[in-house]
Amino acid sequence: MRFVLPKGRLLRGSLEILRRAGYEIDEPGERRLIQRFNGNEVLLARAFDVPVYVEHGVDVGITGSDVVEERGSDVFVPLDLPFGKCRLSLAMPRESVTPPEDMDGYRIATKYERITRNYFSSLGVEVEVIKLSGSVELAPKVGIADAIVDIVETGTTLRANGLVEVDKVMDVSAQLLVNRISQKTKFDEINSLVLAIKEVVKDGA
């Protein structure tokens, strides 16, 4: 099988849960983006690219549910995983807090353009979404946005930038992704992996 794992904060948890499920994978180096073990292949990619790799042919991947939702990729998600837990939230400067339902015409900075549009659409609110790749919390400070939608773990970064959470958009955790064709053509291997990880999760990963 071919696996694709996310660089960054989810890599350690991904390797740990696979090891506990019986897949002994060494941690890839920064320059070593592909490695092989027991006839399997492991790729290392940006978290936001993992669903794309899986949709287009890599058998199995792990990334955050926020990424899966934002990408909208056609992949099978058999399991939520017990790490990478945080939330995607709407936040804005504490001195100008406004209910989401009253934010018609507001500018929202985020790297989650699709999720943000869907969130406000569900409220019947029209906003301007400003797509940023990082340091989203700076946007209200410099006046290019009224609010942000971003990942929140402890809230420390928000507080440091004078922002407060207004609403939770979605809960986030790591997820196991499976290519839809591989799910059929490699059923036994995929099923064994899913069952092994389920046991790890049940025992407390």
Swiss-Prot record:
GO terms for biological process: L-histidine biosynthetic process. PROSITE patterns: ATP_P_PHORIBOSYLTR. InterPro entries: ATP_PRibTrfase_cat, ATP_PRibTrfase_CS, ATP_PRibTrfase_HisG, ATP_PRibTrfase_HisG_short. The keyword Plastid does not apply. It comes from Thermococcus gammatolerans (strain DSM 15229 / JCM 11827 / EJ3). It is found in: Cytoplasm. Its EC number is 2.4.2.17. The lineage of its organism: Archaea, Methanobacteriati, Methanobacteriota, Thermococci, Thermococcales. This is ATP phosphoribosyltransferase. The gene is hisG. It holds the Pfam family HisG. Pathway: Amino-acid biosynthesis; L-histidine biosynthesis; L-histidine from 5-phospho-alpha-D-ribose 1-diphosphate: step 1/9. It comes from the Archaea.
